[in-house]
């Protein structure tokens, strides 16, 4: 952090407060309304042994139209989570959009550009398909949507590169395992350094999965609270080997027998099982039938590395109470959908 940054941050925060006062906004939105449509994929993190590191982008998408308007915040939500979604400044996409505008203003002020200030008004039209609080990265999708929209709409959006976007998304989310595949698509290995999060993207040969989504929800914070502060050395060593094997198995398509071994976990799934006993039981039933299956993220969704036809033949083993989602690995991460009306070229 340079010596001028604290003062610049204080000035920015003071400016943001003034801009949000009625009749005193001075940011984008004076001219014709500008909007973008952003599409973000669902993600599955951990994948068994890759705790807080491995992530996979999936072909289930949220769409949000983000528009800079004359004044106020207007939010329309259709689909998953509509009944509980915030409709004002507390909406996650709005908060992330504003934070990204601040970050871009800092970059502009440090270079040849002029800060844009906060948008005068924001309108969101959300079409949510990713189940909320089920371990499929719905919050990461919202965070990434806000960042992608801000980069597209801010006059100096090109000053934030993909690495900086990952660092910002991780700073907001708290860990990179979902935001990384949401941004990059495919299979990602993410880690943190003193300078922020980083990722490596791979194109997996394993392309099909089935997500079993229950009705119950489970907050990530509750799932994390069940984890012990320390684990046996043998368990840590076993997970390290399995995580390395899993990357090779997914990347090279080594088959179900190897994938079944590669998805073994000793660090988190057993500790979290009391909060989602039905999910833990389904994982065991599938694995006993030779299907590589894991808890998706913090749960309670179960992710099986298989195709829909194989699962259909095992309907009795799966049981009732699950919504089956046959999905492909999404090779592309979050993006602005081209050709939408109002998009800034």
Model-derived features: where do they sit?
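Short beta-strand-to-loop capping motifs
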Residues: 192, 214, 304-308
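Short beta-strand segments
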Residues: 39-41, 57, 182-185, 191, ...
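ATP-binding N-lobe of GHMP and related small-molecule kinases
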Residues: 2-5, 9, 15-134, 152, ...
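DPxDG-like acidic metal-binding loop motif
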Residues: 60, 136-162, 183-185
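Glycine-rich, charge-dense phosphate/pyrophosphate-binding loop(s)
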Residues: 250-345
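Active-site rim beta-loop-alpha module in soluble metabolic enzymes
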Residues: 211-274
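Alpha/beta catalytic cores of group-transfer enzymes, especially the acyltransferase/condensing modules
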Residues: 160-207, 280, 285-286, 293-295, ...
């Amino acid at each position: 952090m340079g010596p001028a940054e604290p003062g610049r941050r204080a000035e920015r925060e003071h400016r943001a407060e003034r801009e949000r006062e009625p009749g005193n906004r001075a940011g984008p939105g004076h001219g014709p309304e500008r909007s973008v449509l952003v599409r973000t994929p669902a993600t599955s993190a951990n994948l068994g042994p890759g705790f807080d590191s491995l992530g996979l982008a999936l072909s289930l998408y949220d769409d949000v139209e983000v528009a800079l308007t004359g004044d106020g915040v207007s939010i329309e939500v259709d689909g998953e989570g509509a009944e509980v979604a915030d409709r004002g400044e507390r909406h996650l996409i709005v908060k992330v959009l504003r934070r990204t505008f601040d970050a871009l203003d800092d970059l502009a002020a440090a270079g040849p550009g002029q800060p844009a200030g906060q948008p005068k008004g924001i309108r969101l039209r959300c079409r949510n398909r990713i189940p909320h609080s089920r371990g499929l990265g719905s919050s990461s999708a919202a965070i990434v949507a806000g960042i992608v929209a801000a980069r597209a709409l801010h006059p100096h959006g090109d000053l934030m590169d993909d690495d900086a976007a990952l660092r910002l998304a991780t700073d907001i989310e708290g860990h990179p395992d979902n935001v990384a595949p949401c941004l990059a698509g495919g299979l990602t290995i993410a880690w943190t350094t003193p300078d922020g999060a980083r990722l490596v993207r791979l194109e997996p040969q394993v392309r099909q999965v089935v997500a079993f989504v229950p009705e119950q929800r489970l907050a990530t914070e509750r799932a994390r609270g069940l984890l012990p502060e320390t684990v046996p050395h043998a368990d840590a060593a076993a997970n390290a080997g399995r995580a390395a094997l899993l990357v090779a198995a997914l990347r090279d398509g080594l088959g179900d027998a190897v994938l079944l071994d590669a998805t073994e976990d000793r660090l988190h799934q057993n500790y979290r099982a009391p909060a989602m006993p039905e999910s833990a039981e389904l994982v065991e039933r599938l694995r006993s039938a030779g299907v590589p299956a894991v808890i998706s993220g913090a749960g309670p969704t179960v992710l099986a590395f298989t195709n829909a036809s194989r699962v259909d033949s095992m309907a009795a083993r799966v049981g009732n109470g699950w919504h089956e989602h046959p999905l492909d690995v999404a090779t592309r991460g979050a993006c602005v959908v081209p050709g939408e009306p109002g998009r800034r070229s």
